[in-house]
Amino acid sequence: LEDLGILKGLKILDFSALLPGPMATMIFADLGADVIHVESSKRVDLTRIMPPYDDDHEAYIHQHLNRSKKSITLNLKSPEAIDIVKSLVQEYDVIIEGFRPGVMQRLGIGYEALKEINPKVIYCAITGYGQTGPYSNRPGHDNNYLSLAGLLDYSRHKDKKPVSMGVQLADIAGGTMHAAIGVLAAALHREKTGEGQFIDISMTDAVFSLNAMYGAAFIGGGRVPQPEQEILNGGSYYDFYKTKDGRFFSVGSLEPQFRKLLCEALDIPELIDNTFNDSYYTQIRFKEAVHDAFLSKTYEEWLEVFNEDFEGCVEPVLTFPEACEHPQLKAREMIVTIPKSDGTMQKQIASPFKFDGTQPEYKHVGAKLGEHNEEVLLSLGFNAEQIKALKEKGVLE
């Protein structure tokens, strides 16, 4: 298989940090895009200092999110650094940033300024609340955006507080994925028209749009989604069940044919005739029967029942180490080895994209801070003496 160059020719300057922007540009880099990560050595990306670390004291999280990207360190408060960015934009014409609204403009490298240099520039700004509105300059984090989007309240159990998820839904499903889709849509538009684009990604907007089912039911029909009252939020037997030894299984056997298989496996055949659209009371009675049945056996005993031949939509709740060893994920090669600068290899989560006849491109793990300063500046025509002077002046942090 050839290396995947499906985005070969797409050149990106990534000014973002933490998770939403870097994960988007990681996706692009995996697909063959050329990404330069513009960083500061004074205000280091927190993912660089989040343990655990490898033998070189480099953070594994950062090495994953920033693989295959070049790293340069610029003091964006210096005019020389701004000139370097403007030079790069003539070639690297996709910008991704995650600052609060107005920061890049004040630095002199906002969309309008860069558009003057390169009219084809695609500029994607990822923020918590968007470029407009009363909250546009308000700081926030993943759980804040989910809270304001109306998603968390009906995702909890009755009389229980919302649960913090292990995966940052607003950051990734909201920020990363919508930024990636937006940039690719803008790139297609540019290919047809020659025009660049400003893309305003609000993570709150994006996760608000994820209220697709219950949000549509409320906006169209006035039905307010309630905790543990809906088919998919615990109001039916579509839920998680504890085993005798304290592990859990997920049950999604909603359709009649799957419910039949579930009832047979749990040895409650008398409940097979309960249909999908039964009353809430009947649903709860059935759920209680499922709950009691699961408590009768251990996790390992249920694994023998709900084995790879069972087709009734029941799966064990795996730990992450168990997921890494699951035969399905191993068959899909979802863990790969990626080279480090010292020639050794590091295991990482693979790109999930499977293209016919091609494979993802993993050049190297996330670079050390400023590792590519000289390489990038030499490509812009700077000589060794000029680069040395920029370092001494603090332009290269």
Q: Can you describe what each PLM-predicted range is?
A:
Residues 196-204, 305, 387-392:
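Beta-strand segments within the central parallel beta-sheet cores of soluble alpha/beta enzyme folds
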Residues 1-182, 186-192, 368, 374-397:
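N-terminal helix-loop segment corresponding to the beta1-alpha1 unit
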